[in-house]
Regions:
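N-terminal flexible/basic segments that precede or flank functional cores
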Residues: 1-30, 89-113
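Short basic helix-loop element that most often maps to the first helix and adjoining turn
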Residues: 34-49, 110-113
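Short polybasic/polar patches that bind polyanions
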Residues: 41, 52, 81
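Short alpha-helical DNA-recognition segment
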Residues: 44-62
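DNA major-groove recognition helix of helix-turn-helix/homeodomain DNA-binding modules
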Residues: 74-91
Length: 113
C-alpha cells in the first residue's frame, strides 16, 4: 500500500511524491492511532478538548486516531503531550540492538585496531 504525501522540492515546493508505506508499517500506525484514541478516552477527554489544547483540527485528530501516516509527527507529538505521553516517544530507537550489532561487527573487522 502506498500513501501520497507532499514533500518539499527546491524546484517546486508542492510537488507530490509518494511515500511508500508497507503493510507492516501501516499496521504499526493503526495500532498507534488506536492506542492514542484509547488513552484519550481513558482520560475522558473529548476530541474537541484535545483539539483546543493542541490547535489541530478534528479532522487531523481523527486521522491521528486512525493512524494516518500523512499526518506530521509534530501533530502526533502534540496530542501525546496533551495525554501526558510525549516522553514515551523518546524511547523510540533507544535500544538499537541491530545498530549495535552492525557497529560491533565493523569494529571487530577493522584492521590494526
Amino acid at each position: 500500500m502506498e500513501m501520497e504525501t507532499i514533500v518539499s522540492n527546491t524546484n517546486n515546493p508542492t510537488e507530490r511524491r509518494k511515500a511508500v508505506i508497507f503493510p507492516k508499517q501501516q499496521q504499526i500506525m493503526t495500532v498507534l492511532g488506536e492506542n492514542i484514541k484509547l488513552a484519550r478516552k481513558r482520560r475522558q477527554l473529548t476530541q474537541q478538548l484535545v483539539c483546543d489544547r493542541t490547535g489541530i483540527s478534528r479532522v487531523t485528530l481523527r486521522k491521528i486516531e486512525n493512524g494516518d501516516p500523512t499526518v506530521s509527527i509534530g501533530h502526533y507529538l502534540s496530542v501525546l503531550g496533551v495525554l501526558g505521553l510525549a516522553n514515551d516517544l523518546t524511547q523510540v530507537a533507544l535500544d538499537d540492538e541491530l545498530g549495535r550489532k552492525l557497529q560491533d561487527a565493523k569494529l571487530l573487522s577493522d584492521k590494526g585496531a
